[in-house]
Amino acid sequence: MAKVHGSLARAGKVKSQTPKVEKTEKPKKPKGRAYKRLLYTRRFVNVTLVNGKRRMNPGPSVQ
């Protein structure tokens, strides 16, 4: 039988310690065709070019 790392008495320790944050209400994301349209505009229309390359998530320091 395989060994476990630590005793099972400590299972879920970190989750019980973290403070509960209520989920905020956000506007609903478009579904289906509308979502694909949003992705197209994000990727190909508002292109972020850095050093001649497309960056998906450029940081604020990148010009």
UniProtKB/Swiss-Prot annotation:
One of its GO terms (molecular function) is structural constituent of ribosome. Keywords: Cytoplasm, Phosphoprotein, Ribonucleoprotein, Ribosomal protein. Signal peptide: none annotated. It is found in: Cytoplasm. The modification Phosphoserine is found at residue 16. One of its GO terms (biological process) is cytoplasmic translation. The keyword Phosphoprotein applies. Disulfide bonds: none annotated. Present with 37600 molecules/cell in log phase SD medium. Component of the small ribosomal subunit (SSU). Mature yeast ribosomes consist of a small (40S) and a large (60S) subunit. The 40S small subunit contains 1 molecule of ribosomal RNA (18S rRNA) and 33 different proteins (encoded by 57 genes). The large 60S subunit contains 3 rRNA molecules (25S, 5.8S and 5S rRNA) and 46 different proteins (encoded by 81 genes). This is Small ribosomal subunit protein eS30A. It comes from Saccharomyces cerevisiae (strain ATCC 204508 / S288c).
